[in-house]
Curated annotation (Swiss-Prot):
GO terms for molecular function: C2H2 zinc finger domain binding; chromatin insulator sequence binding; TFIID-class transcription factor complex binding; transcription coactivator activity. Involved in mRNA export coupled transcription activation by association with both the AMEX and the SAGA complexes. The SAGA complex is a multiprotein complex that activates transcription by remodeling chromatin and mediating histone acetylation and deubiquitination. Within the SAGA complex, participates in a subcomplex that specifically deubiquitinates histone H2B. The SAGA complex is recruited to specific gene promoters by activators, where it is required for transcription. Required for nuclear receptor-mediated transactivation. Pfam families: EnY2. Its main location: nucleus. It is found in: Nucleus, Nucleoplasm; Cytoplasm. This is Enhancer of yellow 2 transcription factor. GO terms for biological process: heterochromatin boundary formation; mRNA export from nucleus; poly(A)+ mRNA export from nucleus; positive regulation of transcription by RNA polymerase II; protein transport; transcription elongation by RNA polymerase II. It comes from the Eukaryota. It comes from Drosophila persimilis (Fruit fly). The keyword Nucleus applies. InterPro entries: TF_ENY2, TF_EnY2_sf. One of its GO terms (cellular component) is nuclear periphery.
């Protein structure tokens, strides 16, 4: 099991997954990331607009790596700290991320 999968299952079982998603969503909105990605999508659609067979899946495939690279380091760091805090707070609980 990968670390990502272990963290995902642990946060889902502990009920903290929604809190992390809400924090990420609000931070991405605050820093303007959502607007940047929206503009990126528009730009790609205008560029590929002549191609009638351009699908949503193709748009997602093209936008995803660029959108991920646009996430500010401060947001990534804050989320990492939040996840570590959740693990530390639940360290003595019965939920073991390796068993998740």
């Amino acid at each position: 099991m990968t670390i990502f999968n272990a963290v995902d299952k642990f946060t889902m079982m502990s009920g903290d997954r929604v809190k992390i998603k809400d924090l990420l969503s609000s931070r991405l909105t605050e820093c303007g990331w959502r607007d940047e990605v929206r503009l990126l999508c528009r730009s790609i659609l205008q560029e590929k607009g002549a191609i009638s067979s351009f699908t949503v899946e193709q748009l997602v495939t093209e936008v995803t790596p660029r959108a991920r690279s646009l996430v500010p380091d401060a947001v990534k760091k804050e989320l990492l700290i939040k996840i570590r805090t959740i693990f530390d707070e639940n360290e003595d609980d019965d939920i073991d991320p390796e068993d998740a």
